[in-house]
Amino acid sequence: MDNNNDLHYCSFCNKAQDEVDKLITNSSDGLKVFICNECIELSHKAISQKKDRSFNSDRISDMKLLLKKPEDIKNFLSKHVVGQKHAQHVLSVAMYNHCQSMVQFHAISDIEIEKSNIMLIGPTGSGKTLLAKTLAKVSDVPFAMADATTLTEAGYVGDDVESVLSRLLQAANYDVVKAQRGIVFIDEIDKITRKSEGTSITRDVSGEGVQQALLKIMEGTVAYVPPQGGRKHPQQEFIQVDTSNILFICGGAFEGLDKIIEARKKGTSVGFGADISQSKEQKKKNALHDVQPEDLIKFGLIPEFVGRVPITAVLDELDHEDLIHVLTEPRNALIKQYKALLAFSKVNLEFSDEAISAIAKKAISYKTGARMLRAILESLLLDIMYTSGNGGFEGSTIVITKKMVELGKATVNHNNNGNVITVND
């Protein structure tokens, strides 16, 4: 009996310490609480099962993309993005596979499907950012964007890489589960390449060091994220974010990459196979579509980083016809936007076909793709929007002409009969 009094029992299952492998107690000097190894294992299983059920339930209810096929994704992209059919094709398959891998993340315990991050290569204004944003929209997931040139290693002035995840948390209204299914777009990734292929013996604040820092969150880890953006608020509590299912899309123009590709392929198109009729622009376009991981490494991305971005999509430079489509065709086409703005002031805004063509031609002269279209329209319509905003032109129709575009300013007025006339046409 005395021996029995010395026995300790599990406070949960009431088994004696000699009936279990291990009995653990709290370190408090007050009331002693004991738990055996069997109860610990049961508790762990119960928590895991509950977590898995809620995780899968969230996916079913929140991720609308799970019901979409690659064709559906591509159709959605094509409604918002002009051209870039190949890139849309690549992204639709990549996003479909990514979402399917998240479904299997808990469903299949013995198979782990690694995520495939994406690299978008294309000139300025070709639609890299728009594609990434639209992909997040069709996926119904939070989206965050960062400029790689503003990121620095820990210990240096600037934004640390965790600030990217902080923006994603904000986009998800601090819903961690939702943020962990989001999309992060890192632009200007080509600007943080190391200066040479050899290993640097000095600190590289905005190059290889940032690639190494990004690599950690891109490959999947539990990051400790400051909700307000790290270094400016060092005393705040950190939020744990698992990046395993966050899709990272990197984008860059990669000027000069075509020359690296051509150097690698040198000699393969000599003789009867050589096409000497191709223009310089066509040769560059064709070269980029043949990009290989070794070319990106030669450009200055570290091998480990390239390995974590296995999917590459090349975007072509937008030509005159493409820019006309950008102005008129997408659901949120720029001309549709400005017509809607003027409609609020009861003004009917119209553009002649020649005017639209002239706007596209002017944008091409700036060599920044579609980015200059809005600036051109803002300058062109400035006086009209000012006057209409003050009650002028109400009930009138204003037609933008080619000459207005060439002059860069559409000045209109009323004649004595109250009709709208064009002063500079």
From Swiss-Prot:
One of its GO terms (molecular function) is unfolded protein binding. Pfam families: AAA_2, ClpB_D2-small, zf-C4_ClpX. Gene3D superfamilies: 1.10.8.60, ClpX chaperone, C4-type zinc finger domain, P-loop containing nucleotide triphosphate hydrolases. The keyword ATP-binding applies. Residues 1-55 form the ClpX-type ZB domain. It comes from the Bacteria. One of its GO terms (cellular component) is HslUV protease complex. Zn(2+) binds at residues 10, 13, 36, 39. GO terms for biological process: cell division; proteolysis involved in protein catabolic process. Belongs to the ClpX chaperone family. This is ATP-dependent Clp protease ATP-binding subunit ClpX.
